Design a protein with these regions (language model features):
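Non-catalytic cell-wall polysaccharide-engagement segments
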Residues: 80, 84-241
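Conserved aromatic-histidine-acidic binding/catalytic patches
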Residues: 31, 40-48, 149-153, 157
Length: 241
């Protein structure tokens, strides 16, 4: 029971419940173990539980340093990333130096592979061509010319990617009524600012339970079981009690 109920944890009221021991359980010695402070700051600044942010990042693959979304190195694969997305728009054929710890915007379409599009979003590649400088096949968003984009983009350092992604999750999900793992996947929140059943964060139907298990194990490892947790559990009419 405990390892699944945390899919209903309210991320806002639990924003201060974390410690290094809990984070270490999620990271397990992987890539995310290098970013405890970054997740704490991102959670504090955006009013979201840092353990949720780290568990989400791990679920999305960022705990592996060589994973393309966080490795900082990505070259166009012509078999999955079309010339339209990169060459026709003269944005270069690499997305080196950009990071996306939560795979935000990472879906296949418009000539991009899923990871390719996520990194294009992180780097600002989906913005106006006038904001781009291209040198030796590498495109760079020009901040001085066009300014910082929404959610702190371009995400050109790991710390900015963690903070900016947390801001995206907070502003477009948590503060819009989708403030639990369950609601982020199954949007039946009575407080949602979107249409019911729409605006899902991920396609994986097992993700809420999987992330809940990670959260519970982290809470136990951090000896946080006696903290005051608030849960938002949807109850259906005619549901057996």
């Amino acid at each position: 029971f405990e390892n699944t109920i945390f899919q209903f944890l309210d991320f806002q009221s639990s924003k201060d419940i974390t410690n290094n021991e809990a984070m270490a359980k999620i990271a397990g010695g992987g890539n995310l173990s290098n970013y405890y402070n970054e997740f704490k700051i991102a959670g504090s600044d955006n009013g979201v539980n840092p353990l949720h942010l780290m568990a989400r990042s791990s679920q999305e693959g960022a705990n592996k340093a060589t994973y393309n979304s966080v490795a900082g190195l990505f070259t166009t694969n012509v078999s999955s990333d079309s010339s339209y997305a990169y060459n026709k728009t003269a944005r270069g054929n690499t997305l080196n130096g950009y990071y996306n710890f939560y795979n935000i915007g990472a879906w296949y379409g418009n000539g991009y592979s899923a990871i390719g599009r996520g990194l294009a979003y992180a780097g600002g590649f989906l913005e106006s061509d006038s904001c781009y400088d291209v040198l030796n096949g590498v495109g760079t968003y020009n901040v001085e010319r066009c300014g910082i984009l929404s959610y702190l983009r371009p995400w050109n350092t790991q710390a900015i990617a963690i903070a900016g992604g947390a801001n995206f999750i907070s502003e477009t999900y948590v503060k819009m009524g989708q403030n639990t793992n369950y609601y982020e996947k199954f949007n039946v929140s009575p407080k949602t600012q979107y249409s019911l059943y729409s605006h899902q964060y991920m396609t994986n139907i097992h993700a809420p339970a999987s992330e809940a298990n990670s959260l519970w194990n982290a809470i136990v490892a951090g000896s946080l079981e006696n903290e005051a947790f608030e849960f938002h559990i949807p109850v259906w009419s005619d549901q057996e009690r």
